[in-house]
Amino acid sequence: MQGGGGGDSSGGGGGEAPRPSRYESQKRRDWHTFGQYLRNHRPPLELSRCSGAHVLEFLRYLDQFGKTKVHAAGCPFFGHPSPPAPCPCPLRQAWGSLDALVGRLRAAFEEHGGRPEANPFGARAVRLYLREVRDSQAKARGIAYEKKRRKRPPTSSSSSQAAAAAAAATSPASPAASPTPPPPPPTERSADVRPMPPEGHFFIPHPHFMHGHFLVPGGDADHHHQVSNAGNGGNTNTNTNTNTGGGGGNGDEMAVAMAAVAEAHAAGCMLPLSVFN
């Protein structure tokens, strides 16, 4: 029956608590060791009265159980990472082991009801001691301690932003997003185009302004010569021919003046008044 009961108990192992991790197991052992150190202390110490100085005593106490060779300053192998021969230098606790031990005890102290602000394993004196141990062992052993930093995986938002930026850089710009081209600069006026003179400084070629102001009409001139010839009793035929020729000459001058006005207006320049005199 007992054997059967033993078989039942072994078979019912599925209902047992899960096995603790390696970190949790080591933390329990470290906390038990520290509690034993407090009980063996003279005089015995209580956890509530423990300070950073007591933690330093505990760390120095653990050096006698260390397995790391730390060369002294006078040792011929000082600073040598791999000495070729043994030396009488003592064994110590490695800095990495002490740093991990303090971290586990600091967590265990708070798990057992300790206040975070009164945690002796987080005291400043303990941090300074660990820093001194790290520097001294690095020089004595010729090893540079460099804390490895974890590389955080990129978040989904940052990866999506990076992908969008890469897609925007590779894809051609859309016409709507592309800026409108600037308007072309105004073209210079060609050399053959003559600038227009200022307003009000050129002659207006209209026949009304020429007739009666600058030229004498042909009919008035003939009448004037006929009257003068009749009064003087001269040769009417001669004067009539002369006036007729003068009338014809006035018509030619009128045509020449009109042609000059048209040419001057096309050229865009002023016409001298001497043309009509």
Curated annotation (Swiss-Prot):
Residues 22-149 form the ALOG domain. Transmembrane segments: none annotated. Residues 1-16 have a biased composition (Gly residues). Its main location: nucleus. One of its GO terms (molecular function) is DNA binding. It comes from the Eukaryota. The keyword Transcription regulation applies. This is Protein G1-like2.
